[in-house]
């Protein structure tokens, strides 16, 4: 959550953390999904991609390399939406460098 907040990406839902059945109706509002634990959420993410065209990132952001890969994949998805919405593209490389510089 912290990394997404640092990157200026609002979080729609965190399932199952504090989620309820009532909250599930808002899932299709997300631009993309994050599946940090494939064994728990991959089937749901695959369903949402198939039914609603919502892509997902399934890299667990643990360790330097996987965190960098996670942020790179998020960047690609955000930039895909930026081109659709005619908004400015983002570049998270500096964020990745700052997060991994002293590790």
UniProtKB/Swiss-Prot annotation:
Which key words are in the record? Answer: 4Fe-4S, ATP-binding, Chlorophyll biosynthesis, Chloroplast, Iron, Iron-sulfur, Metal-binding, Nucleotide-binding, Oxidoreductase, Photosynthesis, Plastid
Involved pathway(s): Porphyrin-containing compound metabolism; chlorophyll biosynthesis (light-independent)
- What is the documented function of this protein? Component of the dark-operative protochlorophyllide reductase (DPOR) that uses Mg-ATP and reduced ferredoxin to reduce ring D of protochlorophyllide (Pchlide) to form chlorophyllide a (Chlide). This reaction is light-independent. The NB-protein (ChlN-ChlB) is the catalytic component of the complex.
**Which proteins does it associate with, and in what oligomeric form?**
Protochlorophyllide reductase is composed of three subunits; ChlL, ChlN and ChlB. Forms a heterotetramer of two ChlB and two ChlN subunits.
Organism per entry? Sphaeropteris cooperi
Q: Among its keywords, does the record have Nucleus?
A: no
Tell me what gene encodes this: chlB
Tell me the protein's name.
Light-independent protochlorophyllide reductase subunit B
| Cofactor (UniProt) | [4Fe-4S] cluster
* Ranges in a coiled coil: none
């Amino acid at each position: 959550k912290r990394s997404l907040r640092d990157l200026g990406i609002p979080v729609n839902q965190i399932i199952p953390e504090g989620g309820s059945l009532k909250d599930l109706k808002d899932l299709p509002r997300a631009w993309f999904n994050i599946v940090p634990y494939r064994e728990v959420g991959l089937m749901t993410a695959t369903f949402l991609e198939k039914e609603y065209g919502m892509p997902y990132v399934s890299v667990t952001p643990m360790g330097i390399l996987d965190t960098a890969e996670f942020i790179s994949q998020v960047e690609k998805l955000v930039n895909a939406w930026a081109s659709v919405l005619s908004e400015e593209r983002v570049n998270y490389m500096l964020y990745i460098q700052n997060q991994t510089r002293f590790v």
